Structures are given as C-alpha cells and as structure tokens.
C-alpha cells in the first residue's frame, strides 16, 4: 500500500457483469498483484471486477462518469444550472487550466484554457491534439474559438495552469501559462480592445 488511490476502469460485459476495461498487461503494470491473482489472460478476461478484487472489495469506492465533455454550467437563478458544451475544438484534448476574463473589452466574459496530456499509461494514445486557446464569449453562454492567426497564441505543449492579470498596466487583460516540461509563457494583450479603468484607493495608511 502506497496511500495513493488507483483507478480501475470498468465496463459492463456479458449478462451486465462489470469487468475491467484495460488488458491485464496494462492494469497489471499498475497493480502487479493481478498477474499472480489472475494467472493468465484467459482467466483474467473471463473474470469480473468483484472476482478479481474480492479481497479488497469492502475498501473499493465506485464512481461513475456521466460525461467526458468539457462543459460550462450557467446559473439559471432558481437554484438550478444549465449544462452547455464548449465548442468542438475544446473537446479534442483534456483541459488542465482555465481562466475567465474580458479579453476584447466588449463587456462580455471570455475564456482562455490550456490542454494536452502527452504522458499517459501504457496502451493509451497521447491526448495532445489541443492547444492554449482563447474563446470569445457571445453573452449567451456560447463562444467563438480564435484560431492561432487571430490570437497569436501558439502553445502546443502540456499546458497546466493559467493566470490572468494586467501585467503591463495598459488596461487590458494579459495571461501567463505554465507547461509540463516546457517554458512558462506570458502573453500581453495587443488587441484594439477598449482599455479598462484602473481604480486605486489611497486614503489612510491602513488601507494603502
């Protein structure tokens, strides 16, 4: 035991029995005791999750994913939220960093997000078809994705975290993005957007 929770992906098999989704070689690399427990591929493929993990069954936690899409949830104002899928381009790779801000100065919130995961488990394809992209809000929960020629943002590595601020104090929102095994990049807003108003409070020594 390492104290780290391991994920066992499962799927419904014949007669609605739950079986591991990954091959023995993949899951065994994560949980080596399975090689001895299952014996061979034939026995493993015909076993249910409960049969394979009977000894650990009481300590397992079952979680269910209802969607793998990247979504926005709009507050309906009555205690309920409306789910809205982000554009198709966003669904090409997992999102690891996201920030909200008005990047074009039209008074409508936009998004900047970072994607990609090149380092995956054995047997899984890299999830690196995404990039860092800016989504311009329409004001109704829908967005237009700027291409690289429009935004000038070209980051195709494993983006992780983003931070938004007016780094050069010109009244426009900029952003910085960090990457796994890549350089941290700062992008200064060079658009013709309307400049924001900077408010500085300066009264007593207490609130300076």
Predicted regions and their residues:
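Beta-propeller-forming repeat regions
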Residues: 1-208
């Amino acid at each position: 035991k390492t104290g780290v929770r391991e994920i066992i992906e499962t799927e419904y098999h014949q007669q609605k029995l739950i079986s591991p989704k990954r091959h023995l070689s993949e899951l065994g690399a994560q949980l080596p005791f399975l090689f001895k427990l299952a014996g061979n591929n034939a026995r493993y493929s015909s076993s249910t999750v409960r049969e394979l993990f009977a000894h650990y069954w009481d300590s397992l936690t079952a979680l269910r994913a209802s969607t793998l899409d990247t979504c926005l949830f709009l507050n309906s104002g009555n205690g309920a939220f409306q789910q809205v899928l982000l554009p198709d381009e966003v669904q090409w790779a997992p999102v690891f960093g996201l920030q909200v801000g008005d990047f074009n100065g039209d008074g409508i919130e936009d998004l900047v997000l970072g994607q990609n995961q090149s380092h995956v488990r054995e047997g899984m394809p890299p999830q690196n078809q995404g990039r860092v992209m800016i989504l311009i809000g329409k004001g109704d929960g829908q967005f237009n994705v700027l291409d690289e020629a429009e935004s000038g943002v070209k980051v195709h590595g494993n983006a992780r975290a983003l931070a938004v601020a007016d780094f050069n104090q010109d009244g426009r929102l900029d952003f910085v993005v960090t990457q796994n095994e890549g350089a941290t990049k700062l992008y200064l807003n060079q658009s013709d957007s309307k400049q924001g108003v900077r408010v500085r409070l300066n009264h007593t020594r207490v609130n300076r």
